[in-house]
Amino acid sequence: IAQCLVGSEMCIRDRSMKRHFILHIGPTNSGKTYQALERLKLAQNGVYLGPLRLLALEVYEKMNDAGIPCTMLTGQECLEVSDSRITASTVEMLDCDKEYDIAVIDEAQMVADDDRGHSWTRAILGTLAGEIHICMSPVAKDVVIHLINLCHDEYEIREYERKTALKLEDKPFSFPQDVREGDAFIVFSKKSVLNIAGRLEENGIKPSVIYGSLPPEIRRRQMTLFNEKKTQVVVSTDAIGMGLNLPVRRIVFLEVEKFDGVSRRPLVISEIKQIAGRAGRFGLYDTGYVTALGQKNLNYLKNTLNIPEQDIDIVSLGFPQVLLTMDAPLDAIIKLWHEAKPSAPFRKINVDEILFLYGYAYKERYFIADFDDKYLLYKMITCPIDIKDRELVRQWLRYCMSYTSDISLDKPDKHSKYQGLMKYESYYKKLDLYYQFSVRVGKIVEDDWLENERDKTQAKIMQLLSKSKDEYIIRCRYCGRILPIGNSRNICSCLLYTSPSPRDTER
């Protein structure tokens, strides 16, 4: 455990391979990833490791369009191309036992992320490639160099400047009077995205929508509508900040606070700069603009954008699977590792969700074949699912209990307590779970059926998104009036002038 807490276990690799790192350091819209990908095109056996399925898909398409055979590999799917020279994948899919001649690790400032940062740590320490390009924000420079030095590898630095100017507007944004084509409106929940989209439609403005629970292919189609000017604006959560290439002229923060899973808090400097940096696109807009709804929010942006970002001083460390060789139950090993203190700059991932799924499975351990097989059980409890979706958790448990009964897993149940968009988004998550769990436990995936179900579900979601979003507009629960953006009480001033009926009071 002590060795694992200083990253030593993750550096165990072919020491005869001398790795050379090229660090591409710069802000958003500086061309750093473009330069790394140009080098990747020359690889005979290369890999791209990015944060999003959409970015892996973008690399996959660009490579194949350029006549370079490229396969895409993510947790949701594998698009295999014969004789491929490049693999475009999400960072979690890295095979640390496979050798490459050139690798690209994108958005490496994510190394400090509480939930996924350990995958970047693993990639930097464990990728087997003679030439590794790392693209990152300047704040990650020192900590990434620290990781490289742990492995006694060489590196060189290439720094980039932003290619388009970024300007904070003097006046606060007024909705909907100030809406312009090319705007991207930033809010921080699905509910808010659909609320704003509905308000825009009320004013004759066609929006694309992007939020986390949308299937990746739907997000891509929504982006395509905006790229092709079939929609005039975008309404998005902070998903827009992670390298998505959109022709955005202006970023409009309608909110400057977000719920982070624990509490509602103001956006931090890095979040604001990452999102604001998406404004302006080289070759299309010479200047990107940033503004906010209301003077108070604009003042917050103005003060925050002038503050230098603090360098990252932590690195996320994942659970080392080498510990599974210990002679102890799996939950005891995980808890023991969790209680141990790592050396700086490492910070261990939160294992609460892993232990939650372990506890869920433990209750049914007598019905789960090979429950004592720690390697297999670890694969099961680390299957990425939304534990807040209890339908999904129940499906996961059914798979744990029945995976040995046939060559393929049972197909997901279409029935759901949810309605509308949420029903189909939840079903799509079930399809993803069917695929991921099958791959983890070595079951045969019925690819044709899965592709057909995904296509039908995506078509239904697109159909629902193309309809009027009036039902999502947040209104006063008493008088039905549209509420001001940011109103969190779901009531307006109507109660100041009229007395609510007894029925309303009961509600």
Q: Each PLM stretch: what is its role?
A:
Residues I145-Q177:
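Interdomain hinge/linker at the junction between the two RecA-like core domains of SF2 helicases
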Residues G46-L55, E181-G198:
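Conserved strand-helix element at the start of the C-terminal RecA-like helicase core
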Residues D311-R475, I482:
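Accessory helical-bundle/CTD segments and flexible terminal tails appended to RecA-like ATPase motors
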Residues D113-R158:
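Post-DEXD/H (motif II) to motif III coupling segment of the RecA-like Helicase ATP-binding lobe
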Residues A2-G7, I12, Y497-R507:
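Single conserved hydrophobic/aromatic residue that forms the stacking wall/gate
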Residues I240-R278:
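Conserved RecA-like helicase motor core of SF1/SF2 enzymes
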Residues G67-C96:
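Inter-Walker segment of RecA-like/P-loop motor cores
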Residues E271-K302:
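Conserved segment of the helicase C-terminal RecA-like domain
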